[in-house]
Amino acid sequence: MNRNPDQNTLPNITLKIIETYLGRVPSVNEYHMLKLQARNIQKITVFNKDIFVSLVKKNKKRFFSDVDTSASEIKDRILSYFSKQTQTYNIGKLFTIIELQSVLVTTYTDILGVLTIKAPNVISSKISYNVTSMEELARDMLNSMNVAVIDKAKVMGRHNVSSLVKNVNKLMEEYLRRHNKSCICYGSYSLYLINPNIRYGDIDILQTNSRTFLIDLAFLIKFITGNNIILSKIPYLRNYMVIKDENDNHIIDSFNIRQDTMNVVPKIFIDNIYIVDPTFQLLNMIKMFSQIDRLEDLSKDPEKFNARMATMLEYVRYTHGIVFDGKRNNMPMKCIIDENNRIVTVTTKDYFSFKKCLVYLDENVLSSDILDLNADTSCDFESVTNSVYLIHDNIMYTYFSNTILLSDKGKVHEISARGLCAHILLYQMLTSGEYKQCLSDLLNSMMNRDKIPIYSHTERDKKPGRHGFINIEKDIIVF
């Protein structure tokens, strides 16, 4: 009687793969739970650990040379992690180990290992900007917005920074050059590339493979330092993850975006690195000043903001020929707030083809109303704008994630009015629409302004969800 090999041979192969991986004969439960992971397990089993150890050592030598650890310690940590499953009997923890080991064996070489080989020549592409000429203008603009009253009784969360940030920054500079199609930067470091006088801390990045990159980096740090590294996901920040050490010290964070979003983000090329176009960053800064917390930051360190603002103003002057003469025309656009329904109506007909923009302060309400409109042409730019946009029957619909400042009862403060205008202009830039005249008027509307006190402000939209995390040491993934 002939036997079907599928009934005997293949299960025996699967059993052998699992047995080799665990270093023991699996229990019946382990076998049935892990058999669908046989392909991943086999990749882990045949993975060349010696080559991997060599890559980690090279990464250590290049980016973490000041960390006091020996080559033998690195090797021991790596081999210990790749044999961890032999001492693990909890099915959930085994699944976590398999998932994280799979990421390492399939992606580490291409993502971080490649940083150890000779880099392409850097294409020097810097332009000399006269930032000094914009410093007084920036100071005048920021001074008129420096209106937050600091509540000394307010307890501020401390942002503890790891001593490894400088090492990770060195790695990130190379990473941004090697992976400039999938990873771009913004914030202080990107402006530092334009103006070396800018101070920066960690490097802010947007990328299309954030989770994989952060897992690989977390393991690199773990293998080099021996520290327990934790990856956290914050529910109210879209597609955001952060790496912290076991003492809750911040190492690096990243926003993940789709490739189609990456393709439309305005960017410029400097020294083999793509940075978010400073025009776009300037609009984001103007938008963020509507957030009361950001105005409090401004009052604490105005010179830090002044250096950034002056750099971006000089960039837009040079790039777009913006003339700062105080001619603001219809900027900021008229904004009327419905505090009960939490919607701001912005009159846009003087600048755009759509006559008005309805800005929702509650994302769920906007989503519901878009469904009622039966419109399927909304644009979601993820964390780039923190909002979707829809134009329907000559009306733009969008969501604004920041607070709205009021200068009097029922009256939108001009800081928030400009923030709302900037939010609309972000859409214009992302969709290759017209924005330069509006940009010129918006920037000129910030000149020669008196300080206007804040009467009150709306609350931010409350985001549902729970914190997620990956704890490498404890073999836990919660998302």
From Swiss-Prot:
The active site is at D202, D204. It comes from the Viruses. The keyword Transmembrane helix does not apply. Ca(2+) 2 binds at D202, D204, D253. Disulfide bonds: none annotated. It catalyses: RNA(n) + ATP = RNA(n)-3'-adenine ribonucleotide + diphosphate. Induction: Expressed in the early phase of the viral replicative cycle. Ca(2+) 1 binds at D202, D204. Pfam families: Pox_polyA_pol (PF03296), Pox_polyA_pol_C (PF12629), Pox_polyA_pol_N (PF12630). One of its GO terms (molecular function) is metal ion binding. One of its GO terms (biological process) is mRNA processing. Its EC number is 2.7.7.19. It comes from Rabbitpox virus (strain Utrecht). Polymerase that creates the 3'-poly(A) tail of mRNA's. This is Poly(A) polymerase catalytic subunit. It is an enzyme of class 2 (transferase). Belongs to the poxviridae poly(A) polymerase catalytic subunit family. The gene is OPG063. Heterodimer of a large (catalytic) subunit and a small (regulatory) subunit. InterPro entries: PolyA_pol_cat_Poxvir, PolyA_pol_cat_sf, PolyA_pol_nucTrfase_Poxvir, PolyA_pol_nucTrfase_sf_Poxvir, Poxvirus_polyA_pol_cat_C, Poxvirus_polyA_pol_cat_N, Poxvirus_polyA_pol_cat_N_sf. Keywords: ATP-binding, Calcium, Early protein, Metal-binding, mRNA processing, Nucleotide-binding, Transcription, Transferase.
